[in-house]
Amino acid sequence: MCIRDSAMAAKFSGMDDERGFIMLHVDINQHSPELVGSVFDFIESKETKGVNNSLRKCLSAMKKINERRQIMWQASRWKHYNDFRVFIMGIKGNDEIFGDGVVYEGVSEEPKKYRGQTGAQDNIIPLMDIFSGIINNYPKNELTHYLKDLRSYRPKCIQNFLEDVRLFFTTSNNSILNQIKANKNFRSLEILLELLEEIYLFRNGHWQFVQRYIMQNTLYPKATGGTPIISWIPNQINAVLKTMQELSLIHISEPTRLLSI
């Protein structure tokens, strides 16, 4: 897939910067099948070699995603973000703009409040959060509540899929960490730390986009999904760092037997 050959079926401003911004998100998702496949491979793996290969496959997909993510700087110029950002701003969470909500003529006389388009509604990082165990370190605060609310906008089948994956990996015997400890699999620990680093790089890269595209372009402190810009992504980055710290403290005795697997 080439982003230059992609076009939008529906558009707002019609500018190249809007097309680049939207279609790069589509471009990134071309690697989602490999990501999802690696999770299923892990679930089905019964031996150490299969577990490690599935983690390598997942790591490879995340590296490709991070490589494509960096194209954003060329795909959509930051100074032009506000030219189309206004069209994807949500109602919910932006009470300063919409007050009591918006009445959709011909649909309902009751004002509605919906959140706007946001990367938090994507499935790449949420799946990785569940798979890697980051979800266990989500802070119990209002920002995490926002995250869960945003995810309720997904198609029901995707919500069910992520919930099934969550239920599987939150069972103690199935969690990656517990499998690593039980099997004394040092190589899995090493690959998982690399995977967490890629998730961190993705979120940190997103944070850099937010600072450049939004914070330098407007004084309005809310993201399109209605979340507070300054604290939203750092909240998620901290969950990644806490998970990495937990892994770094794991001591596995006699790991050398598995180093070459």
Positions of PLM-derived features:
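Single conserved hydrophobic/aromatic residue that forms the stacking wall/gate
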Residues: 1-3, 250-261
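Short, charged/polar, low-complexity loop and linker segments
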Residues: 6-22, 37-45
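Amphipathic alpha-helices that form helix-helix packing interfaces
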Residues: 28, 35-38, 42, 51, ...
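Generic hydrophobic alpha-helical segments
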Residues: 41-42, 135, 206, 259
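Extended, compositionally biased non-globular segments
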Residues: 127-248
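Long, contiguous hydrophobic alpha-helical segments, chiefly transmembrane helices and signal peptides
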Residues: 12, 20-24, 28, 84, ...
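Short, solvent-exposed segments of well-ordered alpha helices
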Residues: 15-33, 49-52, 56, 111-122, ...
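Extended amphipathic alpha-helical segments with heptad-repeat/coiled-coil character used for oligomerization
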Residues: 52-145
